[in-house]
Amino acid sequence: MTPPLGDIAHVGHAQLFTPDLDASVAFFTDYLGLTVNGQDGDTVYLRTYDDYEHHSLVLTARERPGLGRLALRTSSEEALQRRVAALEAAGRSGKWVEDEPGIGRLYLTADPDGHEHALYWESEHYQAPDELRPALKNQPQARPNRGVGVRRLDHVNFLAADVLANAEFQEQLLGARPTEQIRLDSGKIAARWLTFTDKSYDVVYTEDWTGSSGRLHHIAFAADTREDILRAADLAIDTGVFIETGPHKHAIQQ
């Protein structure tokens, strides 16, 4: 049975593992313009300026880089319970934890590829300190005066050994809708873009050519304009940030 639309309200935050925590924090604050909003041991919580929640990104020190969890906020407590019931009825294992500041209990599970997902409802609204208080009341935080100044976390692109199985997990158990895909001449689905909202996409699965499971392709942050993207490229060149590809856009959804 297809889940009701709207049980997943939006992408909440993502967690990345890093072998150099200080350098990673510097990249996200100095270059992208995120703000540190707390630290607990080897874990740092950062936020984009237009996020109403406590954090948008979690950086945790680990020996090897990688993806931790993707957190998805539900539209209500009832929606959270519906998704948990659907996951358990489908045989997906999970557990409840309460281990993040500003967030209530989270239900941890994983897609078929092993990417950890956290579903939650309870969330504290961010209250900016005086030095970050915005002039506009409907803006959670003043726009940063450094770096790119990205507005919000936009989407996560997972690498997957089996794109179709993982995409169907999102569709059948979490309520995502496909908006774009790459189908090879053989009929195999090599990539699929999915959304929980009215955006083009929130979650993407791309075939991992190595056949590995549980890896990350990229996370993406939203800027306001095309000019912001070009400015980000200029800042990358000026500050020594490596540009792997682009700027470019998708052929279909752009």
Language model feature labels by segment:
Residues 1-89, 93, 97-108:
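An N-terminus-focused feature that recognizes amino-terminal "leader" regions
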Residues 1-22, 67-70, 131-164, 177, ...:
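N-terminal beta-strand motif that seeds the catalytic metal site of vicinal oxygen chelate
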Residues 6, 15-53, 158-201, 234:
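Core segments of cupin and vicinal oxygen chelate
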Residues 62, 99-102, 184-186, 209-211, ...:
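A short beta-turn/loop motif at secondary-structure boundaries
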Residues 199-214:
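Flexible internal linker/loop segments at domain or repeat junctions
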Residues 210, 216-254:
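Active-site/pore-lining binding-face segments in mid-to-C-terminal subdomains
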Residues 51-57, 114-117, 126-127, 200-203:
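Short, charged/polar, Gly/Pro-enriched secondary-structure boundary elements
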Residues 1-4, 85-149, 192-193, 240-254:
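Vicinal oxygen chelate
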